[in-house]
From Swiss-Prot:
(2R)-2-phosphoglycerate binds at residues 164, 336, 365-366, 387. The gene is eno. It comes from Wolbachia sp. subsp. Drosophila simulans (strain wRi). One of its GO terms (molecular function) is magnesium ion binding. This is Enolase. Belongs to the enolase family. The active site is at residues 206, 336.
Amino acid sequence: MNKIINNVFAREILDSRGYPTIEVEIELCDGAIGRASVPSGASTGKLEALELRDQDEKRYCGKGVLKAVQAVNGIIADEIIGMNAADQNAIDKALIELDGTKNKSKLGANATLGVSLAVAKAAANSFKMPLYRYLGGKQTSVMPVPLINIINGGVHADNKLDFQEFMILPVGAETFSEAIRISAEVFHNLRSILKKKGYSTNVGDEGGFAPNIESTEEALDLIIYAIESAGYSAQSDFALGLDVASSTFYEDGIYEFESKGLTSEELTEYYCNLVERYPIISIEDAMSEDDYEGWKLLTAKLGNKIQLVGDDLFVTNCELICKGIEEKMANAVLIKPNQIGTLTETFAAIEMAKSNGYKAVVSHRSGETEDTTISHIAVASNCGQIKTGSLSRSDRLAKYNELMRIESTLGKDAKYYRGLAWVL
């Protein structure tokens, strides 16, 4: 009986952009407490679960979350107080049924996710287990390759770059801690290079630099120069990744990219050319979420060569992932818990991807908090990849630091992910 939920409390806090988000605390009868806060995205998929905002322009420019807070402290608390926190499936089923909508629009996915994560943390604390072990079991040991965003563009930065994220993947590291060290060295070398060239070294939402450079190729060239300046190889030590966020520049069947209007076929050829010229092994949201034919074409062309990640295409939703698998769109799924709204549904999406030969990449959002749950999800699921921003801004570093703690705790049992070797 000591795992029974005794108290539920939610409050409004601020995320990394200074906008409100929800934080939830769950207390069990044995005194164990779990606390979780929920992130928020800037570029969002059309079919994501709803993030409930107050729309009261007199508070926080309409972005308050008091409605979500009230839902947790009222109807949700009434439902789950007295339930067993160790039965995550039952808790999440109750949340889904209480909401009763397909996209969590009644209670808000921010409310349901905050509760779902806090319950899991409370149960883990009650069992005196780290969250990754509680969620993943004894076989949990794989440390993820980080996809580290070191140049920001698109809606994450105020510059001319259309692509949203330019990432380094430290695939040649022996351990996660080494991966972070060598990536930090590249990050600081890039800062010095940008400064010498007269570019701004201010950072964007996710901690990457946001210089006002002119083209995708220039960004990639700068990153390769930074890798080599740090004493590493862009062939064996590091690979490159992109988050194109192409839905943000897609309209009426045309991609408005770098002052050119490109068809799906033309954009696919552009990607093929980039992959030939640069050590790119992962491209996210290369086509718009609405451009199914473009996705099929791209996957046919590059799907056996590099990782093609669907974010807006799948929004961590098993129904959409199943459709993508059936129609041969992409070969990897980005996993964002707040796109779906419960921990159970998050793990179901990961399992659906993995069981069908798709990779899974656990991800943050551009508006983050100091919450480190996604670090534990990445390890618990053995998915092998995590995307959680750059090597600046404490909201991003919190996740990396937590992963280094986990690796230290695992000791010799920790295994750095090698599942990206097929694309090298």
